[in-house]
């Protein structure tokens, strides 16, 4: 069961860029709650608190119960904007989530057992194609990460999402089988193989 974190906010009477700038000058972060066929609710959050939560990690895969002046909203963050210079939050979007609903989230991929991949042990390099994957999950059971097992992979092999064991009730949110990583040959081996291929082509042309 995913832990639901509590967050306090106050309602904003006005939306728009001017009102948002005023909130930031007052040391707060403007935000909005939307979805579930209800009217959007414009809110503001404590700057220090939301900054700490964002930088603690897993922000976009965490369920929150936001108390807006005594009214509670069950939500998941959908997006946030950071100041391009200061890297401090400027705005946050929250999506309402009903009990039992499923959500699509980006979940980090952790690559394990590199020491058990012959291709890496022989000098190959792990080329990570996807650091995260889009998954359809029950809102109450969002995984912190998924594990990609590199055991047995040789140079030239690829690891796909279909080889990853997903938790119960969790599935890929995209069509097709995402490539997560490949084992690529070291540069010296690539050059040697290219030379061999060129020599073979030249010999075939003379034959």
Curated annotation (Swiss-Prot):
One Pfam short name: Ribosomal_TL5_C
A GO cellular component entry from the record: cytosolic large ribosomal subunit
Gene Ontology terms describing biological process: translation
Keywords recorded for this protein, A-Z: Ribonucleoprotein, Ribosomal protein, RNA-binding, rRNA-binding
Presence of the UniProt keyword Ribosomal protein in the record: yes
Gene3D superfamilies linked: Ribosomal protein L25, beta domain, Ribosomal Protein L25, Chain P
Protein's name in the database: Large ribosomal subunit protein bL25
Organism expressing this protein natively: Azorhizobium caulinodans (strain ATCC 43989 / DSM 5975 / JCM 20966 / LMG 6465 / NBRC 14845 / NCIMB 13405 / ORS 571)
Name of the gene: rplY
